Amino acid sequence: MPKKDGAIEIEGRVVEPLPNAMFRVELQNGHRVLAHISGKMRQHYIRILPEDRVVVELSPYDLSRGRIVYRYK
């Protein structure tokens, strides 16, 4: 997985789906963030359901929002 420069990758669990392909994700450290699906996952029609384990990429500028870049099988 290519990583964006300066982005922080952390594992989490999807808590609830929200409209417009957004999800509330609980990170390993207990924080909850708002995350959207990355473009490549959208292109390949990867479905994300509640309770899925995912990898979230957080920007160092806004740690309350992120991008889901991987869903564990």
Curated annotation (Swiss-Prot):
Q: Which keywords appear in this protein's UniProt record, sorted alphabetically? A: Cytoplasm, Initiation factor, Protein biosynthesis, RNA-binding, rRNA-binding
Q: Which residues form the S1-like domain?
A: 1-73
Molecular-function GO terms, alphabetical: ribosome binding; rRNA binding; translation initiation factor activity
Pfam families in the record: eIF-1a
Q: List the disulfide bonds.
A: none
InterPro entries the record matches: NA-bd_OB-fold, RNA-binding_domain_S1_IF1, TIF_IF1
Q: Which SUPFAM superfamilies match?
A: Nucleic acid-binding proteins (SSF50249)
The residue stretches assigned to a coiled coil in this entry are none
Cell compartments where the protein resides: Cytoplasm
Per the record, GO CC terms? Answer: cytosol
Similarity field: Belongs to the IF-1 family.
Q: What does this protein do?
A: One of the essential components for the initiation of protein synthesis. Stabilizes the binding of IF-2 and IF-3 on the 30S subunit to which N-formylmethionyl-tRNA(fMet) subsequently binds. Helps modulate mRNA selection, yielding the 30S pre-initiation complex (PIC). Upon addition of the 50S ribosomal subunit IF-1, IF-2 and IF-3 are released leaving the mature 70S translation initiation complex.
Assembly behavior: Component of the 30S ribosomal translation pre-initiation complex which assembles on the 30S ribosome in the order IF-2 and IF-3, IF-1 and N-formylmethionyl-tRNA(fMet); mRNA recruitment can occur at any time during PIC assembly.
Q: Show the NCBIfam families listed in the entry.
A: infA (TIGR00008)
Q: What is this protein called?
A: Translation initiation factor IF-1
Encoding gene per record: infA
